[in-house]
Amino acid sequence: MPKIKTLQAASKRFKITALGKYKYKHANMRHILTKKSTKHKRHLRQKSILPKIYLTTIMKYLPYI
């Protein structure tokens, strides 16, 4: 049986933690930042844990990670 290829776009966007959870960076921090509040931008800077509903999809994309 052939090996399953890893989706490279997903491997660049998601990292696995020591407990086996997936963390990712928030969107909306590239441009048009003047209209966003400081509090909103501060919360977007932090990494977040992937919700369980997306876990099976991401695990298909990253079979060996």
UniProtKB/Swiss-Prot annotation:
> What keywords were assigned to this record?
Ribonucleoprotein, Ribosomal protein
One matching Pfam family, short form? Answer: Ribosomal_L35p
Q: State if Transferase is listed as a keyword.
A: no
PROSITE patterns assigned to the protein according to its UniProt record, in alphabetical order: RIBOSOMAL_L35
Q: Which InterPro entries match?
A: Ribosomal_bL35, Ribosomal_bL35-like, Ribosomal_bL35_CS, Ribosomal_bL35_sf
Question: GO cellular-component terms in the record?
Answer: cytosolic large ribosomal subunit
Q: Alphabetically, which GO biological process terms does the record hold?
A: translation
GO MF:
structural constituent of ribosome
Family, similarity comment: Belongs to the bacterial ribosomal protein bL35 family.
Cross-referenced NCBIfam families, in alphabetical order?
rpmI_bact (TIGR00001)
What is this protein's name? Large ribosomal subunit protein bL35
Gene label? rpmI
